Swiss-Prot record:
The active site is at C303 (proton acceptor). The keyword Transferase applies. Pathway: Nitrogen metabolism; urea cycle; L-citrulline from L-ornithine and carbamoyl phosphate: step 1/1. PROSITE patterns: CARBAMOYLTRANSFERASE. The modification N6-succinyllysine is found at K70, K80, K88, K144, K221, K231, K238, K274, K289, K292, K307. Its EC number is 2.1.3.3. The modification N6-acetyllysine is found at K70, K88, K144, K221, K231, K238, K292, K307. This is Ornithine transcarbamylase, mitochondrial. GO terms for molecular function: amino acid binding; identical protein binding; ornithine carbamoyltransferase activity; phosphate ion binding; phospholipid binding. Acetylation at Lys-88 negatively regulates ornithine carbamoyltransferase activity in response to nutrient signals. Catalyzes the second step of the urea cycle, the condensation of carbamoyl phosphate with L-ornithine to form L-citrulline. The urea cycle ensures the detoxification of ammonia by converting it to urea for excretion. It is an enzyme of class 2 (transferase).
Length: 354
C-alpha cells in the first residue's frame, strides 16, 4: 500500500513539475525590440525591411542558443497547429518545419498532392478559408507564386512561402544566419552567385542590400533573373549604397567574392529541359579555379540537393563549405519564422552584429 502511495505521489510530482515547466518556460529578461511581426505573411523578403529580417535572424540565433546549447524546453507553440501544403517534394523544408514546429510544442500536419490539389478539387479561396478555421498558420511549397498570393489574400492566418517559382525566402534566412555565424557580420560581404537566375537568386536580390551586402551574379544567356526583380534590386542597391552587377561570366562574378553560391541547374518541373540546360550551363561548375579569383576568406553555399556538375567535390566537401551548417540552420530559422508570426515572444540573447 505504501508502495502504491509513493507511485501516486511521484506521478503527481511529475505532473506538477511538467505544468510548472510549461508555464515558466520564458525565464530570463527578454531584450526589447520595436519589431512586431505577429500575424504577418512571409511570401517574399521584398515585403520586409532590413530591421525585420534581422529580427528573424536574431530570433533564430536566440532559439538555437537556448534550445541547442542550453538545453532549455521552450513550448512557445504549444496548442498551435500548422498546415503544410507541398506540391513539390522536399527533404530539408519538410523535415526542418515538422521537427522544429513539434520541438516548440506545436502540431504540424503534412498534406501532399494526394491529399489536396490547390485550385483543382476546391478553389483556393475555399481552401484558404477552411485552413484558416482549422490551423494557426500554413506553410506552402508550390509551383506558382500567384497561388500563395491568393491564399494570403483569402486566409485569416499567416501564410509562409516554403518555395515557389519566384522566391524561396526561408532558404535565404538560413543562408544569412550561417554567414553571420561564420563571419560575425553580414555588412560589407560580397555574394557571388554562379548559376540559374532562379527563386534563390531572386530572394537574395530582395534582401542582400538591406544588410549592406554586395551581389555579383553570373547566369547563362537566356537564364537571367526576372527583369522586374532586377529593377527592384537595383533600387535597393542604390538606396543602401551597395553594388549589384549582372554578367554571363562566372569568373567575373566570383572575382573578389566572399561567398560563392550556386544551386541546382534543373529544378523540379524542368526535367524535360535537362539536356538543353546542361549544355547552357557549361563552364558554370564551381571549382577551385573559381575560388582562386575569390576573396582570401571565401566560403561556399549550396541549398541542396547538389549534383557534381554544379560544384566539384573539392569545393563542396572542403573546410570552406558551409553547406551542412546551413542545412541545420534551416530548422532554427523556420522555427524563428513561426514564433515571430504566431507569438509575442522576444529574444533573450543579446542581438548579434549584422
Amino acid at each position: 500500500m505504501l508502495s502504491n502511495l509513493r507511485i501516486l505521489l511521484n506521478k503527481a510530482a511529475l505532473r506538477k513539475a511538467h505544468t510548472s515547466m510549461v508555464r515558466n518556460f520564458r525565464y530570463g529578461k527578454p531584450v526589447q525590440s520595436q519589431v512586431q511581426l505577429k500575424g504577418r505573411d512571409l511570401l517574399t523578403l521584398k515585403n520586409f525591411t532590413g530591421e525585420e529580417i534581422q529580427y528573424m535572424l536574431w530570433l533564430s540565433a536566440d532559439l538555437k542558443f537556448r534550445i541547442k546549447q542550453k538545453g532549455e524546453y521552450l513550448p512557445l507553440l504549444q496548442g498551435k497547429s500548422l498546415g503544410m501544403i507541398f506540391e513539390k517534394r522536399s527533404t530539408r523544408t519538410r523535415l526542418s518545419t515538422e521537427t522544429g514546429f513539434a520541438l516548440l510544442g506545436g502540431h504540424p500536419s503534412f498534406l501532399t498532392t494526394q491529399d489536396i490539389h490547390l485550385g483543382v478539387n476546391e478553389s483556393l479561396t475555399d481552401t484558404a478559408r477552411v485552413l484558416s478555421s482549422m490551423t494557426d498558420a500554413v506553410l506552402a511549397r508550390v509551383y506558382k507564386q500567384s497561388d500563395l498570393d491568393i491564399l494570403a489574400k483569402e486566409a485569416t492566418i499567416p501564410i509562409v512561402n516554403g518555395l515557389s517559382d519566384l522566391y524561396h525566402p526561408i532558404q535565404i534566412l538560413a543562408d544569412y544566419l550561417t554567414l553571420q555565424e561564420h563571419y560575425g557580420s553580414l555588412k560589407g560581404l560580397t555574394l557571388s552567385w554562379i548559376g540559374d537566375g532562379n527563386n534563390i537568386l531572386h530572394s537574395i536580390m530582395m534582401s542582400a542590400a538591406k544588410f549592406g551586402m554586395h551581389l555579383q551574379a553570373a547566369t547563362p544567356k537566356g537564364y537571367e533573373p526576372d527583369p522586374n526583380i532586377v529593377k527592384l534590386a537595383e533600387q535597393y542597391a542604390k538606396e543602401n549604397g551597395t553594388r549589384l552587377s549582372m554578367t554571363n561570366d562566372p569568373l567575373e562574378a566570383a572575382r573578389g567574392g566572399n561567398v560563392l553560391i550556386t544551386d541546382t541547374w534543373i529544378s523540379m518541373g524542368q526535367e524535360d529541359e535537362k539536356k538543353k540546360r546542361l549544355q547552357a550551363f557549361q563552364g558554370y561548375q564551381v571549382t577551385m579555379k573559381t575560388a582562386k579569383v575569390a576573396a582570401s576568406d571565401w566560403t561556399f553555399l549550396h541549398c541542396l540537393p547538389r549534383k557534381p556538375e554544379e560544384v566539384d567535390d573539392e569545393v563542396f566537401y572542403s573546410p570552406r563549405s558551409l553547406v551542412f551548417p546551413e542545412a541545420e540552420n534551416r530548422k532554427w530559422t523556420i522555427m524563428a519564422v513561426m514564433v515571430s508570426l504566431l507569438t509575442d515572444y522576444s529574444p533573450v540573447l543579446q542581438k548579434p552584429k549584422f
